[in-house]
Each structure stands twice: as structure tokens, then as C-alpha cells.
Regions:
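Blade-level signature of beta-propeller repeat domains, shared across WD40, Kelch, NHL, RCC1
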Residues: 219, 224, 232-263
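A eukaryote-biased signal for long
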Residues: 532-704
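A broad "non-catalytic interaction surface" signal
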Residues: 260-456
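Short loop/turn segments that connect beta-strands within beta-propeller blades
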Residues: 45-48, 88-92, 131-136, 182-186, ...
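Repeated scaffold domains used in trafficking and secretory/extracellular systems
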Residues: 21-22, 60-68, 102-115, 151-160, ...
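A short beta-strand motif characteristic of beta-propeller blades
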Residues: 49-57, 92-101, 138-150, 187-194, ...
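Conserved beta-propeller blade signature
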Residues: 25-34, 74-77, 117-121, 167-170, ...
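An edge-strand/N-cap motif at the start of beta-rich repeat modules
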Residues: 21-52
Length: 704
């Protein structure tokens, strides 16, 4: 180390001005210095909540490279505007610190305080330090700046001292590598890869040896476990997402590293599942800043120092605040369960259930709700119990917040977390799917029946999926899902599904529901004036989208996103006769919207009596056979089982077992997909891959 000769002085004249008083204690908050002129925020590292503490430090400057002096309880920083050292007390008013030999050819953005020495770092310039002890007896003392090294390779934007071993750590923004610095020589030692990149403008330690870094670009707070010497020696130092804080292009932080991160009068809510589910703070368990507005149940949650690990419970400490979620019906594999969520205010609910009872929420399908929007009061939700869930007791976690994108762990700036032990019943049910477990088929309709008209087969396009639950070789439940893909019609049409061969009386109406865009409808859509089991999805599909285009998703030069999805969950009575139930995909069809015109040569306002089905599928009991049979080019013949086809086998509805790209508006199906003609004429024996986009004419089909 070398001491530079005195060549530059930075002096402040205090006169009769009162000096800033130090902090009263070693505060648990982290302090975030942002913007120019600088503003100081209090950052709760546990939840990510930030609060503006001081918008005016008394100096119209940017302050960076800040660090907290534990012995004298001041924050020291570097004024990048005037290239001078400042300090702030408990009122966050900045005052100039007199120095000698402070470099003037560059600024500093990296700094921290340890053992009453203020350390500064600049990539390519070196490591510097300032002895702060003379200020104890003379606040106007001139402090000498010492240059420890002249080389500094890692690209840092902050570093911090470990309160346990006194080592100095920082992350290279370019590589994500964690380095330890020798404060006597300035030499750096590579520890390991944190796995994260970015401008980590603020770094802090807590008393337990956890290193927290805040990334400027997105405000995300990461935590690195440096509490274990063996882990450090092994280079096992991953940065784990811990909370969401404020983002800023100019960011620096200071904190009293000897303080715990949670105050004794905590206003943070934790969970209480076993710690294998990541419940405690050490495990990065879920925790919410209690904001006084956002909670589940009837009462504001009480604050905890940490997560309670089962058999201890949040309900045995403070108030009984685990009362926001109610399981109305049993959790039976393959079936839907009704959940009641009581919310204090509108917000977002996410939830996880450990279906395979392996002690975590990491597995596929274990996130059961994702940013489900709740309104104030009682919310009824449908939860589909995983078909492969194990029988017996397991755990569920519910998180309610004003934030979206929460995981089962990590911090939140608002809301509450509630953990529940639940019981799942698995009595041997199995599932079968159409067209596959996760795939969707395509239904495409031409609504000009019994005429072919433009035959663009895009008047109604619906993506379609079915899951049947089977017990003892008997269908007991069916879930039909759909995504509205396109509407190229001039007429108004509805959409429905018939479970042919099944009587309406076989439906368990108390356990049958229909959801539109995730919200439960008031009724299931079951037609009460029909003998068959027919479900109306919509009487008018034009009410399910809005567009500035001439048509919805049929013109490549004018595109929209999907706007409507439905989920129809049908449960059958225990003694239901399903011996005549048709197989999947059942009978999906379109019909004329009631009270609307549907073309020449048809009865005025035919409504439900006008239907279009897949080829060779008989219409429902509501079809007006007397007035509609024999019209146009349709050659339906009940005696031979022919329905909804022309003499050349052209149908008015298509079922394709994949997500298909339909013809553009006014483009004949055969023009877009030439191979379809021979497919139809052969009765489906030739050109069976006609619908693949590789067999289509470019620019003749819609490309989402």
C-alpha cells in the first residue's frame, strides 16, 4: 500500500451549522440511493417493499458508493457530481467530509465501510480507502485517501463486507462471477459463478452472512448464501431470486450488516408448512409485507419473525388468521373441487398443491392457480384435482397479493400467505384425452348451409380438447375446453356441444360448471328444455371478441389475439347410464343466434332450429327437419346415415386433430388446400395430410 502525497484538498466549512446526528441504532432496513438528485429509499430486503425516506438530502447531487459505519452509525458516500465524500446521519442530510488526495480524474460508484475505513473501488483504477477515525474527535478533520492498488479487473457496481469474517465481496456484472477482495493488497480471488448477470448496483449483508444484491435493470433482489465457509470454498454461490424491489438506472445501497433483516416488531406474514416446502426465511420461504389492505379471510394477518415449521402453526401465535380459503367439496382425483376464497380487496391469487406428496411444490401441474384475479368478498373457484394425485394428506399453499408472477417462495410487498394441510382421495380413476393429453383439435365451420357460398371454412373456428375421467370402465366426468380461434362470418352464430346418447337427467347439475375466461358462469349451459345432454357455450359468438378488422382473425394484414376460452366441466350422476354415450369428440355444432337473420331461403330468424354439425352427424332434437330438410346442395339422408354433406362429399364442418391454420377470408378451402378436393371425393382415404401447412398455398391461409 502506498500513501499518495497531498495534492488535492476537499474542504467544507461548517461554521455554526449543526452537524448531522448519527443513527440511533443499527437499523435492519437497507437504504437504497437512487436518481440524480439523489433520493433515499428504505428497502425491506425480505419482501422487496420500498419507501421513500428522503427526497432532499440538502445537496442537489448524485450520491453513490455508500456504506454504513457500524461504530459511528453514519452512512458515507461519494458525491459523483462534485467528486467529494459526504456523510449522512439519521435525518439523511448530506454534509461534506474533508479529504486529501481524492482522485479528480474519475468518479467512484463502488464503496463500503468496515472497521471505520471507507473503501472505494473503480474498475481499471484500483482500490482506495479512507480512515474515518479522525472524525470522532474533529468533524472537520481532513481525511487522507490511500490507494491500495492500481489494478482492478472485475467490473463491479457495488461490493459489501461480510459481518462474520470481514471479507469484501462483489459480483462482476459481465460474468456473474463472485469475487473476494484482499483489503490490504487489492487482489481479487474468484469464488464462483452466481448464475446471474446484470448491473448489481446495490449490495448488502445481513448478520447471518447472506449477501443481497439488487439489480438495476429490474429491481430484482437476489440472495447468495455466504454463511458457510465450506460452501464458499467449494464455489457453490448461486444467486437465488429473493424479492422484487424498485428498478433504477442509478442505484446504490448501504446497510448495517450487524442487524437482522427482520425487526422484532415484524409486519411480515410467513407460511407454516414443513420447511421442505421452503417456508422459513433461511429457505427463502414465502413472505408478505402486511399492507393493511390486502389479506385473505376476516382479519388482518399478524406479523412473524419467521415461518412456523409444522407442527408449529401461525394460528398458535398471535391471531388465528389462516381463515381465507375454504374447501367446499372433497378433493377427489380427476374431479373439480369448489374452493371459496374470501378476499379483503381485489388482488391476485396463486396456489400450489403437492399432488405427489414429495414435500415440495416443484412438480408439473402443482401450480393450481396462477394470478387468479379476485374481487373483494367471497370468490368461488374451481380446482381440478390432478388425476395422478396420491391418496392421503398433503400440503397446499395460497398466496394473495397486489403483485403478479409470485412463486411458491420469495417475498411480496403486499398480501398474505396461507398454508393448509389437506386430504386427497384417489379411488383408482383414470383419464383419457382427445386429441391428446395437452393438444387441441380444430373445429372449422362454414355457416352458409345448405349452400357452399365462399366455402372458406372460417366462419367459426374453435380449438377443442376433451378429458374423460373413467372409473371401472365407466365415464364419470368429462371436461371440454375450447379456445375461440376465428370468426369470418357475416351471420351471427352460437356454439354448443351435445353428448349424444346421454340423457339430460344423467347430469349431476350440482357438480357441473362452465367457465368463460376463467370465471365461473351462473349456469352450466345445460339446455333445460331438451331431453338430450346439450350444453350451450354461447348463443352469440360475436359477443366474445372485439376487433377493428373486418373479421376476427381471418385476414393476415389485420390480426388479433385470442380473446375467449371456455371450460365445461360435466359430472355424471353415480348411477348414470352411459352405455349409449358417443365417444369423444362428441357432437360440437354451431347454430343460428336466436332472433337473427341467417340467409335467404331459410325460415325467418331460425335460431336454435338451424344447426350445422360435422359430416354424417345427425342434428339434435331441436333441428327443424320439416322446414330445412332437402334445401340447397345438402344431400342428407337419414336412412343412409348421411348428414351435412354435398353430393361430392364436401362437408360444412371439419374436425382436424391438431391446431390448424384455416383459409383467409373469402378464400375457398380447395384454393388454400388443393389436396382437400381429392380427400373429400375419396371419402377420406386419400391425401390424409391435406390440412398440413406444407400442403397449403402460401398467403392463402391465416397465420396467427
Amino acid at each position: 500500500m502506498r500513501i499518495l502525497p497531498i495534492v488535492a484538498l476537499s474542504l467544507a466549512t461548517y461554521g455554526g451549522a449543526a452537524l448531522a446526528a448519527p443513527f440511533d441504532t443499527c437499523p435492519s432496513k437497507a437504504y437504497l440511493f437512487q436518481s440524480n438528485p439523489v433520493q433515499v429509499y428504505g428497502l425491506n430486503l425480505v419482501t422487496g417493499q420500498s419507501t421513500l425516506i428522503q427526497s432532499d438530502t440538502g445537496m442537489d447531487v448524485n450520491i453513490n458508493g455508500v456504506g454504513f459505519d457500524f461504530e459511528n452509525r453514519y452512512i458515507y458516500g461519494y458525491d459523483t457530481t462534485n467528486k467529494q465524500i459526504v456523510r449522512l446521519g439519521h435525518d439523511f442530510q448530506a454534509e461534506i467530509v474533508n479529504t486529501a488526495n481524492l482522485p479528480t480524474g474519475h468518479t467512484f460508484y463502488v464503496g463500503d465501510v468496515h472497521d471505520q475505513y471507507y473503501y472505494l473501488y473503480r474498475t481499471g483504477k484500483g482500490l482506495f480507502r479512507i480512515d474515518l477515525r479522525p472524525l470522532e474527535s474533529d468533524p472537520t478533520a481532513i481525511l487522507l485517501v490511500e490507494q491500495i492498488s492500481s489494478s482492478a479487473s472485475p467490473k463491479l457496481t457495488d461490493f459489501a463486507f461480510h459481518p462474520g469474517d470481514g471479507s469484501l465481496y462483489g459480483i462482476d456484472n459481465n460474468s456473474g462471477g463472485l469475487y473476494r477482495f484482499n483489503t490490504s493488497t487489492g487482489a481479487e480471488t474468484y469464488i464462483g459463478d452466481t448464475g446471474e448477470l446484470g448491473t448489481f448496483g446495490a449490495g448488502y449483508f445481513d448478520v447471518n452472512g447472506y449477501y443481497y444484491v439488487s439489480r438495476n435493470q429490474d429491481g430484482q433482489v437476489y440472495r447468495i448464501d455466504l454463511s458457510d465457509d465450506a460452501q464458499i470454498a467449494a464455489g457453490n454461490v448461486p444467486a437465488v431470486k429473493f424479492a422484487d424491489g424498485p428498478s433504477s438506472s442509478q442505484n446504490d445501497g448501504a446497510r448495517c450488516a450487524n442487524a437482522p433483516v427482520i425487526d422484532e416488531d415484524s409486519t411480515i406474514d410467513f407460511g407454516d408448512a414443513p420447511d421442505s416446502y421452503q417456508t422459513t426465511l433461511a429457505s427463502n420461504g414465502p413472505r408478505h409485507q402486511i399492507d393493511g389492505m390486502t389479506w385473505l379471510g376476516n382479519s388482518v394477518p399478524d406479523g412473524e419473525q419467521d415461518g412456523f415449521v409444522s407442527p408449529l402453526s401461525d394460528n398458535t401465535s398471535g391471531s388465528n388468521d389462516e381463515d381465507g380459503i375454504g374447501f367446499v367439496t372433497a378433493l377427489e382425483t380427476g374431479f373439480d373441487s369448489i374452493i371459496i376464497a374470501n378476499a379483503s380487496i381485489s388482488g391476485y391469487l396463486s396456489a400450489w398443491i403437492d399432488w405427489n406428496q414429495d414435500g415440495d411444490f416443484d412438480d408439473e401441474n402443482e401450480k393450481v392457480f396462477s394470478d387468479k384475479e379476485l374481487t373483494a368478498g367471497t370468490n368461488q373457484l374451481l380446482l381440478n384435482v390432478d388425476i395422478n394425485a396420491l391418496n392421503g394428506n398433503t400440503w397446499a399453499r395460497f398466496r394473495f397479493s397486489q403483485q403478479t408472477g409470485l412463486n411458491y417462495n420469495g417475498g411480496s410487498t403486499s398480501g398474505e400467505v396461507e398454508d393448509y394441510q389437506i386430504n386427497v382421495l384417489n379411488d383408482g380413476a383414470t383419464a383419457r384425452h382427445f386429441p391428446s393429453e395437452f393438444g387441441y383439435a380444430t373445429l372449422a365451420y362454414e355457416d352458409n348451409w345448405p349452400y357452399t357460398a365462399d366455402y372458406d371454412m372460417n366462419d367459426v373456428v374453435m380449438f377443442y380438447h376433451i378429458t374423460e375421467i373413467v372409473k371401472e370402465n365407466k365415464v364419470v366426468k368429462s371436461t371440454i375446453k375450447g379456445r375461440f380461434a376465428a370468426y369470418g362470418a357475416d351471420y351471427k352464430n352460437g356454439f354448443a356441444v351435445r353428448l349424444a346418447g346421454l340423457s339430460r337427467s344423467e347430469i349431476d347439475t350440482a357438480r357441473t360448471f362452465q367457465q368463460h375466461n376463467g370465471a365461473i358462469n351462473e349456469d352450466s349451459g345445460l339446455e333445460l328444455d331438451a331431453n338430450e345432454a346439450i350444453f350451450i357455450i354461447s348463443n352469440d359468438l360475436t359477443s366474445k371478441f372485439s376487433t377493428n378488422c373486418s373479421y376476427y382473425r381471418t385476414i393476415n394484414s389485420c390480426k388479433d389475439s385470442e380473446a375467449f376460452a371456455f371450460n365445461l366441466s360435466i359430472t355424471l350422476k353415480e348411477d348414470a347410464d352411459v352405455s349409449s354415450l358417443m365417444g369423444m369428440p362428441y357432437d360440437p355444432f354451431i347454430f343460428a343466434s336466436p332472433g337473427t337473420y341467417h340467409g335467404q331461403g331459410l325460415p325467418n330468424h331460425p335460431g336454435r332450429s338451424y344447426e350445422i354439425h360435422l359430416a354424417d352427424q345427425a342434428p339434435t332434437e331441436k333441428f327443424d327437419t320439416d322446414n330445412l330438410a332437402g334445401l340447397g346442395v345438402d344431400v342428407s339422408d337419414e336412412s343412409s346415415g348421411v348428414y351435412f354433406k354435398t353430393a361430392t362429399n364436401l362437408p360444412w364442418a371439419l374436425l382436424i386433430t391438431d391446431e390448424w391454420e384455416w383459409p383467409t377470408e373469402r378464400t375457398d378451402l380447395v384454393t388454400a388446400y388443393p389436396s382437400f378436393a381429392e380427400y373429400a371425393q375419396s371419402g377420406g382415404s386419400k391425401n390424409t395430410d391435406w390440412f398440413e401447412s406444407s400442403n397449403a398455398i402460401q398467403n392463402k391461409y391465416y397465420q396467427p
